[in-house]
Design a protein with these regions (language model features):
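Conserved C-terminal structural/oligomerization subdomain of aldehyde/semialdehyde dehydrogenase
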Residues: 2, 7, 56, 89, ...
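ALDH superfamily catalytic-core signature
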Residues: 1-114, 138, 142-143, 177
Length: 209
C-alpha cells in the first residue's frame, strides 16, 4: 500500500481502513505494509489515528459494530506477539496494541524500517498498520519488492503517470490505483507472484481455460 506525497490523504485513509480492517485484518489480500512518502507520513498517521478512534469492536451481529474479533484467542495472541516483536526491533507503538481475549484493537506501528521482519516477510493477520516511511517512488518499489509475497497492492497518487510507473514495477499480481486492496472485480483474474501462489483463478480465467 504505497502513498506518494501528492496523494489525497482522506481517500488513502478511507481505503487503508477497508484494506486492513476487513474481517479484522484476516484477509490474504489485505494490506500489510504501508509505504508512505516522508513528506506526508505524519499527516497520514494523524488522520489514520483519528479514523481508528471511531472503530467500534464488538459482536458482528450488532449493526453498530465496525470490527469483530479474530478467529480465535490464539490468533489474537499471535498478533500481540508479532506487535511486541516488531517494537523490540525498534518500531514505535503509536496507537492501539491491546488485546482482550480474541479481540485485538486496531494498531499503528510507526518508525518501521525496511530491515524489520514486518516490512519484509512477517505477515500479520490482524488489524495492524505497519507504517514504513519512504523518500521516493524508487525506494517504495524497492521496499515493496523485497518480500517473498506478491498478491495485491495499491498506489495512491494524483499523478497517473507516477502511479502507473510504480504499479508496473511492482512484483505484485494485482495493483489498484487510488483504491484499496480489498477491490476484486469478478471479471478480472486473481492470483499471486512468488510465495503468494502460482497461476490465476476467477470467472474470466476459468472460461479461457
Amino acid at each position: 500500500f504505497i502513498i506518494m506525497e501528492d496523494a489525497v490523504l482522506d481517500l488513502a485513509v478511507q481505503e487503508a481502513m477497508m484494506s486492513r480492517l476487513l474481517f479484522a485484518g484476516q484477509v490474504c489480500c489485505g494490506s500489510k505494509r504501508f509505504l508512505v512518502h516522508r513528506d506526508c507520513v505524519d499527516a497520514f498517521v494523524a488522520k489514520l489515528t483519528d479514523a481508528l478512534k471511531q472503530v467500534k469492536m464488538g459482536d458482528p451481529k450488532d449493526p453498530t459494530t465496525t470490527m469483530g474479533c479474530l478467529i480465535s484467542e490464539k490468533a489474537a495472541m499471535e498478533v500481540e506477539s508479532q506487535v511486541a516483536y516488531t517494537v523490540e526491533q525498534g518500531a514505535t507503538l503509536a496507537y492501539g496494541g491491546h488485546r482482550n481475549g480474541a479481540f485485538f484493537e486496531p494498531t499503528i506501528l510507526t518508525d518501521v524500517t525496511p530491515q524489520m521482519d514486518v516490512a519484509r516477510d512477517l505477515e500479520v493477520f490482524g488489524p495492524v498498520f505497519s507504517i514504513i516511511p519512504v523518500a521516493s517512488a524508487g525506494e517504495a518499489v524497492q521496499v515493496a519488492n523485497a518480500s517473498r509475497y506478491g498478491l495485491s497492492g495499491a498506489v495512491f497518487s494524483e499523478n497517473s503517470k507516477t502511479a502507473l510507473s510504480i504499479a508496473e514495477r511492482l512484483d505484485t499480481a494485482t495493483v489498484v490505483i487510488n483504491g484499496g486492496t480489498d477491490y476484486r472485480p469478478p471479471e478480472l483474474s486473481f492470483g499471486g507472484y512468488k510465495k503468494s501462489g502460482i497461476g490465476r483463478e476467477g470467472v474470466s480465467r476459468t472460461l479461457d481455460e
